[in-house]
């Protein structure tokens, strides 16, 4: 008579055959265990450096990236839910001479990246401002932000949801998910009333807030 093998013995044998054993239970998804006994949660994988000025291979958690951005990339940080920054482009006729700007924001107990840069959309010179959340997409969805550029009696406002830095800076920019201004229109917003294409000065202001959950 052949010996009977119960389910627990089968499961134990299967786990022994796996290079990366799996912890399972009845209410949660699988969590994979590495050979060094470290448990890997897919949602906690390292973040890539959000600095877009040059290719940077640094990865890590949010605290490590904050130190890296401030110490190695000299990125400044602002505190508070409201902010105002001035962007100056000395030669708006040539976007390849333009500089882009990254500022870190500390508000609502979380960190955000504020980008402003010049680029070409097909052949049209554009300026774009947008924000990204330093965390995962699920939590990013609980925040909203607004950006506004104004000057000379004109005002343009954008409101949106910050994308997670899990999405690359280029992905967000190419999807046009932010405040976009053509160069021609940007000159009308220039704070020194400059329409000679010699210099562009834009004041970009905004705020961040956490959305309240809707009660049913």
From Swiss-Prot:
Gene3D superfamilies: Apoptosis, Tumor Necrosis Factor Receptor Associated Protein 2, Chain A, Classic Zinc Finger. A zinc finger (SIAH-type) spans 5-74. Belongs to the SINA (Seven in absentia) family. Disruption phenotype: No visible phenotype under normal growth conditions, but mutant plants are hypersensitive to drought stress. Its main location: cytoplasm. GO terms for cellular component: cytoplasm; nucleus. GO terms for molecular function: protein homodimerization activity; zinc ion binding. SUPFAM superfamilies: TRAF domain-like. It is found in: Cytoplasm; Nucleus. Probable inactive E3 ubiquitin-protein ligase that plays a role in regulation of autophagy. Upon starvation, involved in maintaining ATG6 homeostasis by competitively associating with ATG6, a component of the autophagosome complex. Acts as a positive regulator of drought stress response. Functions as a positive regulator of abscisic acid-mediated stomatal closure. Keywords: Cytoplasm, Metal-binding, Nucleus, Zinc, Zinc-finger. Expressed in roots, rosette leaves, cauline leaves, guard cells and flowers. Induction: Induced by abscisic acid (ABA) and salt stress. The keyword Protein transport does not apply. Homodimer. Interacts with SINAT1, SINAT2, SINAT3, SINAT4 and SINAT5. Interacts with ATG6 and TRAF1A. This is Probable inactive E3 ubiquitin-protein ligase SINAT6. It comes from the Eukaryota. The gene is SINAT6. GO terms for biological process: positive regulation of response to water deprivation; protein ubiquitination; regulation of autophagosome assembly; ubiquitin-dependent protein catabolic process.
């Amino acid at each position: 008579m052949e010996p009977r093998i119960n389910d627990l013995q089968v499961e134990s044998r299967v786990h022994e055959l796996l290079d990366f054993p799996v912890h399972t239970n009845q209410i949660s998804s699988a969590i994979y265990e590495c050979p060094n006994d470290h448990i890997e949660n897919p949602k906690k994988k390292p973040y890539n450096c959000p600095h877009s000025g040059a290719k940077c291979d640094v990865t890590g958690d949010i605290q490590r990236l904050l130190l890296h951005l401030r110490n190695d990339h000299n990125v400044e940080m602002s505190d508070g839910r409201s902010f105002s920054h001035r962007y100056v482009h000395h030669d708006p006729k040539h976007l390849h001479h333009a500089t882009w700007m990254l500022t870190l924001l500390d508000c609502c107990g979380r960190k955000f990246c504020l980008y402003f840069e010049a680029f070409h959309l097909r052949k049209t010179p554009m300026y774009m401002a947008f924000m990204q959340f330093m965390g995962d997409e699920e939590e990013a969805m609980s925040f909203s932000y607004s950006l506004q550029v104004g000057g000379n009696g004109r005002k343009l406002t954008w409101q949106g949801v910050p994308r997670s830095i899990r999405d690359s800076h280029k992905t967000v920019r190419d999807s046009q998910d932010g405040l976009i201004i053509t160069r021609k229109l940007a000159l009308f917003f220039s704070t020194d009333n400059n329409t000679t294409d010699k210099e562009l000065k834009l004041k970009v202001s905004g705020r961040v807030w956490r959305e309240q959950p809707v009660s049913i």
